[in-house]
Amino acid sequence: VDELLHQAMEPVLRDLRGAGIAAPRIEDDDWSDDPDAAAVMLWSSDGSGTGVYVSRSAPACERVAAMADQVQEWAIEELWGQASTSWPECPRHPNGHPMKATTRDGVAVWSCPADQTPFSEVGAL
């Protein structure tokens, strides 16, 4: 796995593990034609796959936030029909919506999408 992609993905995988969500199988797959993109496939236990990527030229915090957004989409699909799909759940609005990955002051954070209140650095849930 590309080192920049690994660095962007590890904090998000930490948050998945902290929530008790099984991490996907990660497979090198340069499916993107963009030379600036570092890409892999995430494979679910049911055999379905999702491609994720980061821009090599983006700042580190933006790579982490972009990866968090894509892994969150994978997790929501994975949880569908089994558990709450509100991952990670917004503490301000329980059962309302999941938090959204954004950047603030050079750090990737999970924030409320309604009022942008930051709650946790990505990787520290």
At which residue positions do the language-model features occur?
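Short, non-transmembrane alpha-helical segments in secretory-pathway proteins
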Residues: 4-16
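Interaction interfaces in information-processing and related assembly proteins
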Residues: 15-63
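Short, compositionally biased leader-like segments
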Residues: 1-2, 6, 59
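Cys/His-clustered metal-coordination modules, chiefly Zn-binding fingers
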Residues: 56-125
